[in-house]
């Protein structure tokens, strides 16, 4: 949480994207501390620099954040399945490519399941992160906040009650859902292959690069 605060406070006009691959308690702690140590004006300034991309919602802290900080740009994407390749693809094109590939772990659950949260911010000419309705490798989102987008089922099973914070508002996936990512599957993986090739290519001109 201290790192988040330090990163937001840097003299940098760019927004800070929080890619949430798990629970949101760390960001919640950062926001709580800032709220209890700064003026309302400075809290608003802090929040204005933050952007959140939450994969699936994996605890109840996201609902608490959305409820207590309604000015925060908060995306929760629950349409993130179906785009990764199979295990054989990752073995052939990643794990067998040089020293870096060797440390790429075999999956236990979903391969690259949370990756859309940072793929969304890759500057590939398709999207503009500040325009969530444009679409790109990380998906496309509604410009209208949706009410009470719930977390994964296991959050309820672990007796975490998001509805205590209802109503809370977040940006959610557009009507096309997971297809907004799935249509870019080949492009995402071609880019991944190229980057792996860079790790074993000594000369820049001998590898494939973007125009």
Where are these regions (language model features)?
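N-terminal acidic, glycine/proline-rich low-complexity segments
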Residues: 1-210
């Amino acid at each position: 949480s201290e790192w988040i605060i330090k990163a937001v406070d840097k003299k940098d006009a760019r927004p800070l994207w929080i890619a949430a691959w798990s629970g949101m308690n760390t960001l919640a702690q950062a926001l709580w501390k800032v709220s209890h140590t700064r003026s309302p004006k400075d809290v608003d300034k802090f929040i204005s620099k933050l952007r959140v991309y939450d994969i699936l919602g994996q605890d109840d802290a996201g609902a608490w954040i959305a409820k207590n900080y309604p000015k925060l740009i908060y995306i929760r994407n629950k349409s993130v399945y179906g785009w990764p390749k199979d295990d054989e693809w990752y073995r052939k094109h990643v794990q067998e490519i040089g020293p870096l590939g060797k440390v790429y772990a075999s999956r236990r659950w979903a391969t690259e399941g949370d990756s859309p949260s940072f793929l969304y911010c890759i500057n590939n000419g398709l999207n503009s992160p500040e325009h969530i309705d444009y679409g790109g490798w990380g998906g496309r989102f509604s410009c209208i906040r949706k009410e009470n987008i719930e977390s994964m089922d296991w959050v309820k099973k672990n007796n975490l009650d998001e509805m205590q914070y209802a109503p809370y508002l977040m940006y959610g996936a557009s009507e096309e859902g997971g297809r907004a990512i799935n249509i870019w599957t080949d492009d995402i993986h071609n880019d991944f292959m190229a980057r792996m090739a860079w790790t074993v290519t000594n000369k820049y001109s001998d590898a494939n690069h973007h125009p």
